[in-house]
């Protein structure tokens, strides 16, 4: 099965669903709303208010409430600017994109009562689902004015290439992501894959976004130059330990562990900046990295803290993990993961690093 068929957040509205476990993403989205508000204001300063409709896309939208916040913010800012400029009311067309396996049913069920259908709305809003990979083309040329994406662009199209020796041996044995014990070739392979995929993303958007159009991208990243620092490896490192314990119990085939590498990469600011500048289609209007404590760290009881952390981790890791190791082992795996997290959190409480990036499409 290809990554694009297995990469999605846990579905439904149960305890381990993404819809119920995306509070941190909501926090990040809320914190970065002033940046999105400023992006909308900038569009109006470039005469985008003369249009009949503003076309916006939320890429990698998943099925949590963050999308509702994004749409509401764009609508509110459009209404504010239309009143200030005394211009005709624009309509808002929003495209919600994610891979076909995404839980669009839960997304649109929540959307209908929160964003659309308001009889008193100043800016009419029309929402369309667009299943597909954002690493390729999704929209017609010069059709988008604003693109938003939160916690999606760091996912890769595939596990990095070149992680097997000429003799067929796994080069990242016993690990599922970059680790302190990983050889340099593993780090190089991950960066190379991110470079390739992010470049594809930029190339596709460069054709779809109108000149002077804007993109607001938020992704997991790191402040350190070392990709094996715990700020970016914590969850994957502990999951690898949990999987290895099940291997030792004969519940998982060791070869499945040795040949699995997570299709995700948390880049540094310098790496992101370098790729954008090399691409040459967009200017960087704003870029910063910031750290936040995981919300589970506010819990005093270590078991409650560990269980909540594991539940959130399961929401975004289970689909890709179960695709490799089997659905039948998931409850046991995440139970083991919870125990490991509880013992590890007493010594390490890593902050979560995010990168926010505002890009403008170059004219000409």
UniProtKB/Swiss-Prot annotation:
Record-level Gene Ontology MF annotations: metal ion binding; methyltransferase activity
Annotated site, Involved in substrate discrimination, chain positions: 148, 220, 264, 312, 327
Gene3D superfamilies per the UniProt record, alphabetical: Methyltransferase, alpha-helical capping domain (1.10.1200.270), Vaccinia Virus protein VP39 (3.40.50.150)
InterPro entries the UniProt entry points to: MeTrfase_7 (IPR005299), MeTrfase_capping (IPR042086), SAM-dependent_MTases_sf (IPR029063)
Keyword Hydrolase: no
Names of the cofactor(s): Mg(2+)
Binding annotation for Mg(2+): 172, 258, 260-261
Source species, domain of life: Eukaryota
EC number: 2.1.1.-
Coiled-coil annotated spans: none
Listed GO biological process terms: methylation
Keywords: Magnesium, Metal-binding, Methyltransferase, Transferase
Cofactor binding annotation: Binds 1 Mg(2+) ion per subunit.
Binding site for S-adenosyl-L-homocysteine: 18, 61, 98-99, 133-134
Homology family: Belongs to the methyltransferase superfamily. Type-7 methyltransferase family.
Reported function: No detectable N-methyltransferase activity.
Name of the protein in question: Probable methyltransferase ICS2
Lineage of source species: Eukaryota, Viridiplantae, Streptophyta, Embryophyta, Tracheophyta
Name of the gene this protein is made from: ICS2
